[in-house]
Amino acid sequence: MKKFNDLMSVSNEIENISASEAKEKLNDPNVQFIDVRDKESYSKGTIGNAIHLDRGLLEFYLAEGRPLENDMFKNNPDKEYVVFCGVGGQGTLATKTMKDMGVKNVKNITGGIKEWEKIK
C-alpha cells in the first residue's frame, strides 16, 4: 500500500502556485478557478467565480464520451485552470489527474483555500 508521502509526491509533477500568485489571476477572464472540495464545503464559500467540480467525479467530467463530460475543457483548450481544495491534497491529485487527462494549462494552489483565507 502506498504511503501518504508517496501519494503526495505527484506534487513534483504539476505546477503549483502560491495563494498570492493565484490572487493576481482572480479577475483574469482567461483563468477559471476550480474548487474540487465536496459540495457542502463549496456551498459555504469559495474563491471568486470558482466552479465546483467534485474531486470524486473529476474523471467523469474530463473523459470524452462520459455522462458528465464538461464542454468547458473541450471548448477552451487555451484557458488556464487554477485548482484548489481545502488544504492542498485533493487539489494536488486533481491537478495531476487533469494534466494526465490532457488539460494543458492547469495549476494547483499550494495550501488550498486555507492559504487563500490568510491573504484575503
Annotate each language-model stretch with its function:
Residues 84:
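Short, surface-exposed ligand- or partner-binding patches at beta-edge/loop junctions that are enriched
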Residues 1-31, 39-80, 89-120:
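Rhodanese-like catalytic fold shared by cysteine-dependent sulfurtransferases
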Residues 35:
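Conserved active-site aspartate in kinases
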